């Protein structure tokens, strides 16, 4: 695969993911009920604000749909990439570059947090961030979970259990979100958790089953010799995802420090 084709495919995948990420289900679900979620509670279009103002069923629907935005973006990129297999020609180049499908899922998170109207307003108002904030999206937690699920079901399972454990114990959705996404890049450094199931095993260069039949060779579980390129790229993407999602929670962090953050699923609608 020549560099020109690779750059073209990367741009295409980023565009696809960002476009899908721009579909803000929080707004669509709220408008189907005759209201605009941006005028309720915190004004955020994410599942938490929807739950607090429109109920748990609406919140759950938004959470699931936001989850599948990033997962579906990665899957669409996978289908396109496989369709390009024969035009690429070089099988080794095709296998080694397969990791770029995850750019679609990552771009969907960006599109979810900062849709095109946000940037349009930002440039139109000469970088008036307060005005552009009115058109910002969600905080990216559900989409980040979908992105993790597109990489590895094991990674998603760990994040799922960790998130709900912290949420149920602390009663803070924001704290659970921040801690879970902060640890997300770490899981990607463990090869057998970072299981690229969407790609063929031959392409992912990884054995999904750790060598439990050789208990004295624990180091074999952390064998980076074959799939280090996939692990490096997904680690960087998940690191950027963590930075983005934590940044989107900056106001929540301040309220947590001050002891002013709302408990999960409180009935009163203040700020999120």
Swiss-Prot record:
Listed InterPro entries: G3P_acylTferase_PlsY (IPR003811)
Gene expressing this chain: plsY
Subunit structure: Probably interacts with PlsX.
Stored Pfam families: G3P_acyltransf
Catalytic activity from the UniProt record: an acyl phosphate + sn-glycerol 3-phosphate = a 1-acyl-sn-glycero-3-phosphate + phosphate
Protein name listed in UniProt: Glycerol-3-phosphate acyltransferase
High-level lineage: Bacteria, Bacillati, Mycoplasmatota, Mycoplasmoidales, Mycoplasmoidaceae
GO CC terms: plasma membrane
Subcellular location: Cell membrane
């Amino acid at each position: 695969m020549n560099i020109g084709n690779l750059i073209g495919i990367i741009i295409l995948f980023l565009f696809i993911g960002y476009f899908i990420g721009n579909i803000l289900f929080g707004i669509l679900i709220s408008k189907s009920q005759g209201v605009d979620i941006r005028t309720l509670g915190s004004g955020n279009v994410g599942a938490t604000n929807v739950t607090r103002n429109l109920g748990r069923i609406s919140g759950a629907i938004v959470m699931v749909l936001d989850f599948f935005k990033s997962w579906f973006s990665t899957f669409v990129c996978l289908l396109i990439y496989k369709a390009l297999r024969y035009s690429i020609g070089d099988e080794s180049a095709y296998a080694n570059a397969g990791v770029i499908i995850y750019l679609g899922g990552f771009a969907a998170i960006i599109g979810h947090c900062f849709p095109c109207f946000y940037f349009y307003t930002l440039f139109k108002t000469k970088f008036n961030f307060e005005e552009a904030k009115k058109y910002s999206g969600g905080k990216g937690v559900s989409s980040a979970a979908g992105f993790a699920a597109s990489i590895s079901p094991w990674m998603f399972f760990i994040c799922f259990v960790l998130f709900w454990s912290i949420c149920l114990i602390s009663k803070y959705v924001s704290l659970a979100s921040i801690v879970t996404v902060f640890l997300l890049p770490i899981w990607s450094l463990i090869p057998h958790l970072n299981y690229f199931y969407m790609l063929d095993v031959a392409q992912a260069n990884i054995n999904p089953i750790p060598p439990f039949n050789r208990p004295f060779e624990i180091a074999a579980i952390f064998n980076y010799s074959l799939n280090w390129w996939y692990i490096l790229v997904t680690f960087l993407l998940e690191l950027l995802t963590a930075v983005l999602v934590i940044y989107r929670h900056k106001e929540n962090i301040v309220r947590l420090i001050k002891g002013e953050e709302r408990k999960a699923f409180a009935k009163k609608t203040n700020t999120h």
